[in-house]
């Protein structure tokens, strides 16, 4: 994909509004709850046995 300069600026402006820490944590939590088999890839994270623990 080849973005124009204007499209690149729009994309950067949208991503600048996102709280990466919060969105990343929420996305990872949903991943581990909705697809519990993915927990095996994150064994170093500790207790992932329930949504509350995650």
Curated annotation (Swiss-Prot):
This is Hemoglobin subunit omega. Residues 2-54 form the Globin domain. One of its GO terms (cellular component) is haptoglobin-hemoglobin complex. It comes from Notamacropus eugenii. Belongs to the globin family. GO terms for molecular function: haptoglobin binding; heme binding; metal ion binding; organic acid binding; oxygen binding; oxygen carrier activity; peroxidase activity. The keyword Metal-binding applies. PANTHER family: GLOBIN FAMILY PROFILE DOMAIN-CONTAINING PROTEIN, HEMOGLOBIN FAMILY MEMBER. It comes from the Eukaryota. SUPFAM superfamilies: Globin-like. Hemoglobin omega chain is an embryonic-type beta-type chain found in prenatal and neonatal marsupials.
């Amino acid at each position: 994909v080849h973005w124009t300069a204007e499209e690149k600026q729009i994309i950067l402006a949208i991503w600048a509004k996102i709280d990466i820490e919060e969105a990343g944590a929420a996305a990872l939590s949903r991943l581990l709850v909705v697809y519990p088999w993915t927990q095996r890839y994150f064994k170093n994270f500790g207790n992932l046995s329930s949504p509350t623990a995650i």
